[in-house]
């Protein structure tokens, strides 16, 4: 993994991935990197690297026994928490946070179906999540300052994916999967 300068395209190697791990996520401040190792179709490990440390260390942040799946969902906008999904606590995948300051873990979203994704607006005011509910993705957009869900109006029937906010958070873009039409933005 290299860090490139946008000014002159010079590069600095941050980490040599000799283990053949899959890139999971990079924090918005560029300090944290998560890699995944698929041990089988039912067992995954996640590894964290602090690229600002004087000595880079690949830390397994999901030590476990048995078949447990973990997947990277990204970081909070302030780069202080890593978000991941796991089926460690039941049949369905839940979204959890890992505090990068303290190492504390906390459930973020747990439903009666799999949590498919979690994302944030640039400032962190809004959180979007998708839950797979009987082969349909139920999307929730929450204003974290009020705790209220935002109702999306005039959205065609289908599954919303890859929800993105513009910089001032006044609009969103998303992809839409429908069984009667191809994927549309």
Predicted regions and their residues:
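Conserved beta-propeller blade repeats
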Residues: 1, 12, 16-37, 42-46, ...
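Structural motif
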Residues: 1-2, 41-48, 91-96, 135-141, ...
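Short polar/acidic secondary-structure junctions
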Residues: 6, 38-40, 51-52, 87-89, ...
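Short hairpin/turn module used for nucleic-acid contact or packing/dimerization
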Residues: 138-139, 143, 163-166
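Non-catalytic extracellular/periplasmic "stalk"
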Residues: 141, 146-156
